[in-house]
Amino acid sequence: MAFAEAEKLTVDQFLEAIAGRDGRFELVRGIAYAMAGAKQGHNVICSNVLTALVPAAKRKGCRATSSDTALQTGPDTVRYPDVVVDCGPPNPAALTASSPTIVVEVSSMSTAVFDYSAKLREYQAIASVDLVLQIESEIALVKVHRRQQDGYWTEETVEAFDRDIDLPSLEASIKLNEIYDTLDVRPRPRLQDFKIGPAGP
């Protein structure tokens, strides 16, 4: 099924339309959009995170899955995060996560602004989600968004490679050096890292 320009789809129509199609798509307010392909570094990070989360999720009766698992974030919006931990009842035929608790997005310079705004708000609006990790692919930096008991969200930036990021719902943790394993990424430059020349005349 080809997507006509500005053709409005329901969630069910969208999921049926993309079944078996090459490429990645998302549904945003009823409109299907093709997603750009990912660089190798992005894919390595996703694989590293998935490798760390799968055994921890299994111990808690949950499932950590890749970007093929959909999240319905609105009545006519479907997202495909890079990694999702779903703690709902197992359903091998399901196309969407029933009770997502952890959502992971790997961002690049071209996607960071959007991922840090619209998608984040959508993920935080899902009642079962209590942790969102936004991982930079080009520098060593992870933004950790946690839902507190009062319903409010906190944000923490983690940049130290040996720092643990706690995953309370899985009773586990992950370090930056696990996330960026095999990749040559560095922390973001600090002001003192730049040499500032003398002022001009």
Task: Cite the ranges covered by each PLM segment.
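Gly/Pro/Ser/Thr-rich low-complexity, intrinsically disordered segments predominantly at protein N-termini
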Residues: M1-P201
